[in-house]
């Protein structure tokens, strides 16, 4: 295998990181909706924590995207 084919295999593996971020964000918000349905009085605190968690999970996907772009254009 040459270096170009290995580069594109690495880019494909970066897609797994973006897929994991999407699964993490969907899991966070499905749990948020379940928790708010059980205890509506805690909705404000739960929303704040869920948004922080979603931002961190989405950051991992963005890091994977940036690394994939660096691999493509390097």
From Swiss-Prot:
Q: Name one Pfam family in it.
A: ATP-synt_C
Intracellular or extracellular location(s): Cell inner membrane
Q: Which UniProt keywords apply?
A: ATP synthesis, Cell inner membrane, Cell membrane, CF(0), Hydrogen ion transport, Ion transport, Lipid-binding, Membrane, Transmembrane, Transmembrane helix, Transport
Which molecular function term from Gene Ontology is one that the record holds?
A: proton-transporting ATP synthase activity, rotational mechanism
| Its biological purpose | F(1)F(0) ATP synthase produces ATP from ADP in the presence of a proton or sodium gradient. F-type ATPases consist of two structural domains, F(1) containing the extramembraneous catalytic core and F(0) containing the membrane proton channel, linked together by a central stalk and a peripheral stalk. During catalysis, ATP synthesis in the catalytic domain of F(1) is coupled via a rotary mechanism of the central stalk subunits to proton translocation. Key component of the F(0) channel; it plays a direct role in translocation across the membrane. A homomeric c-ring of between 10-14 subunits forms the central stalk rotor element with the F(1) delta and epsilon subunits.
Q: How does it assemble?
A: F-type ATPases have 2 components, F(1) - the catalytic core - and F(0) - the membrane proton channel. F(1) has five subunits: alpha(3), beta(3), gamma(1), delta(1), epsilon(1). F(0) has three main subunits: a(1), b(2) and c(10-14). The alpha and beta chains form an alternating ring which encloses part of the gamma chain. F(1) is attached to F(0) by a central stalk formed by the gamma and epsilon chains, while a peripheral stalk is formed by the delta and b chains.
Name this protein carries in UniProt: ATP synthase subunit c
């Amino acid at each position: 295998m040459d270096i170009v084919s290995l580069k594109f295999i690495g880019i494909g593996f970066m897609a797994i990181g973006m897929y994991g971020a999407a699964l993490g964000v969907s899991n966070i918000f499905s749990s948020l909706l379940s928790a708010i349905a059980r205890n509506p009085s805690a909705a404000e605190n739960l929303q704040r924590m869920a948004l922080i968690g979603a931002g961190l999970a989405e950051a991992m996907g963005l890091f994977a995207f940036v690394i994939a772009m660096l691999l493509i254009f390097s």
